[in-house]
């Protein structure tokens, strides 16, 4: 059981293995019980300030004796010039910025009598979260029932402490004090809204910064909850950013099930041993190596992105450039100023601009095949604990930028079932993949292609195409369904010779939804 304390109110949508079991008010707090892939999270939305925070954690610990871990996830200000809007810090050290009891002997500024100078948490849980590699930077959090508004206040704080505090907030330190006395795990994850010394009045990109930080909060929580609820021991600390994007997307869509495609009895998911991931059983006797490659990964150009449409040319110059990847990850819903802390993602009008160049199924399949053929040239093996790993697998992740109809040749009926539609997409790719790879020998025990296709009625369609098992032989994907090939025809909607009323069916689109 894990507790989450935040001043931001957010909800989890019930779907698959995610369910809000209970929600109720206590004092001025909203308490939610969320069952997330089998693990229980207690989410508490609190008022601002140290007293509210201390009261809430005390209540949670008394109400739920099994609660041994607390996370404080929230927005904050930074006094560190290295932090930008949307950056996320992890804090394991906390101090008070407004405690001055130095009149007592040996008491330093920020210290409470009979309490340590700071509250530090360096246990196993902090390492677990750091190993998730969520893009966190470490920093000291200073808590007070006041913010810093000018350079004079900042200088006074530095003079009193002798060093700079990285993050300032109004809750984390109070939670840390109670957590320390209660001997539980505790860390704080803070999404930076702004530098504390930057002017707040008439900030031309204030709304953008609020969208950015609130969306980053949602983005962080989804990835964090996915990994914390996993049954595996996970260390992604040595993964590349491309690998991390693929891994986190797979945990989002399939949770632990995607790992079982390669090794059902996996106990540890580890990086830093040569392949993208090493999948290790509990006895560490039969590890499996997993290479991950990306095909057609979208890149954000400096002058592109939906934020430019909203902000305009001048304001865009000062806006962060990492927005598009986050926006595409999130569910698009409209938000107004009153709803920001309800954790809803911003939705933008792109004026029908295309985010991607549309590709045909054949073109995408050939690009995937070319990447597989190149990777299969590497016949080397990996080692784990001094022994050669006998099996290695290949996962190919592709952002399939395709747009088409699939129509029944006789009835022209719509294909509305998601699973059947996915099967039809897979079937169409198979004929091109097998033809392109017929002369390629693979050193991999199995190759699995994972594609995500933006769809009209679904936020994202997942397509998994596994090859036949067996290393050191030709690449052959699961048998093509000839009947489906006879009964259905793919109609490329980039052409102008189709009639959507006549062809009907399963439509895939590359445009963001608009209301």
From Swiss-Prot:
This is Fibril protein. Acts as a cytoskeletal structure involved in the shape and motility of spiroplasmas. Residues 206-228 are annotated as: Helical 2. Residues 426-440 are annotated as: Helical 4. It comes from the Bacteria. One of its GO terms (biological process) is nucleoside metabolic process. InterPro entries: Nucleoside_phosphorylase_d (IPR000845), Nucleoside_phosphorylase_sf (IPR035994). The modification Blocked amino end (Met) is found at residue 1. GO terms for cellular component: cytoskeleton; cytosol. NCBIfam families: FIB_Spiroplas (NF033570). The lineage of its organism: Bacteria, Bacillati, Mycoplasmatota, Mollicutes, Entomoplasmatales. One of its GO terms (molecular function) is adenosylhomocysteine nucleosidase activity. It is found in: Cytoplasm, Cytoskeleton. It comes from Spiroplasma citri. Keywords: Cytoplasm, Cytoskeleton. Residues 21-34 are annotated as: Helical 1. Residues 357-376 are annotated as: Helical 3.
């Amino acid at each position: 059981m894990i507790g989450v304390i935040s001043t931001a109110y957010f909800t989890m949508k019930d779907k698959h293995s995610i369910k809000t079991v209970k929600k109720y008010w206590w004092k001025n707090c909203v308490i939610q019980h969320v069952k997330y892939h089998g693990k229980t999270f207690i989410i508490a939305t609190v008022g601002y300030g140290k007293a509210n925070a201390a009261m809430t954690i005390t209540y949670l610990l008394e109400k739920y004796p099994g609660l041994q871990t607390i996370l404080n996830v929230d927005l904050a200000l930074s006094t560190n010039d290295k932090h930008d809007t949307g950056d996320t810090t992890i804090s394991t050290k906390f101090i008070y910025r407004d405690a001055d009891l130095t009149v007592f002997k040996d008491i330093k500024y920020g210290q409470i009598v009979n309490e340590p100078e700071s509250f530090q948490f360096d246990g196993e849980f902090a390492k677990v979260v750091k190993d998730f590699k969520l893009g966190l930077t470490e920093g000291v959090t200073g808590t007070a029932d006041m913010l810093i508004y000018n350079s004079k206040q900042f200088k006074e704080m530095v003079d009193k402490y002798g060093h700079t505090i990285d993050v300032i907030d109004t809750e984390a330190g109070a939670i840390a004090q109670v957590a320390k006395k209660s001997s539980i795990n505790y860390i704080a994850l803070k999404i930076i809204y702004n530098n504390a010394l930057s002017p707040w009045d008439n900030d031309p990109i204030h709304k953008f910064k609020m969208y950015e930080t609130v969306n980053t909060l949602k983005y962080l929580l989804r990835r964090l909850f996915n990994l914390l609820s996993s049954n595996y021991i996970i260390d992604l600390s040595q993964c590349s950013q491309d690998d991390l994007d693929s891994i986190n997307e797979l945990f989002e869509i399939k949770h632990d099930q995607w790992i079982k495609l390669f090794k059902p009895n996996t106990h540890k998911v580890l990086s830093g041993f040569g392949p993208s991931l090493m999948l290790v059983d509990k006895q560490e006797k039969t590890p499996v190596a997993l290479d991950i490659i990306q095909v057609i990964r979208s890149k954000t150009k400096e002058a592109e992105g939906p934020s430019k449409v909203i902000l305009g040319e001048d304001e865009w110059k000062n806006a962060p450039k990492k927005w598009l990847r986050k926006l595409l990850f999130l569910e698009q819903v409209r938000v107004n100023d009153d709803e920001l802390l309800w954790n809803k993602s911003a939705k933008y009008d792109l004026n029908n601009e295309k985010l991607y160049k549309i590709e045909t199924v054949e073109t995408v399949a050939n690009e995937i095949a070319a990447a597989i053929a190149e990777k299969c040239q590497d016949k080397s093996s990996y080692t784990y604990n001094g022994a050669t790993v006998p099996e290695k697998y290949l996962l190919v992740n592709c952002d399939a930028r395709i747009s088409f109809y699939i129509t029944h040749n006789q009835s022209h009926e719509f294909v509305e079932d998601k699973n059947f539609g996915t099967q039809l997409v897979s079937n169409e790719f198979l004929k091109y993949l097998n033809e392109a790879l017929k002369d390629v020998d693979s050193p991999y025990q199995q190759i699995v292609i994972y594609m995500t296709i933006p769809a009209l009625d679904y936020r994202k369609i997942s397509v998994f195409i596994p090859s036949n098992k067996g290393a050191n032989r030709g690449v052959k994907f699961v048998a093509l369904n000839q009947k489906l090939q006879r009964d259905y025809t793919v109609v490329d909607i980039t052409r102008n010779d189709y009639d959507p009323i006549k062809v009907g069916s399963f439509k895939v689109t590359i445009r963001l939804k608009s209301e």
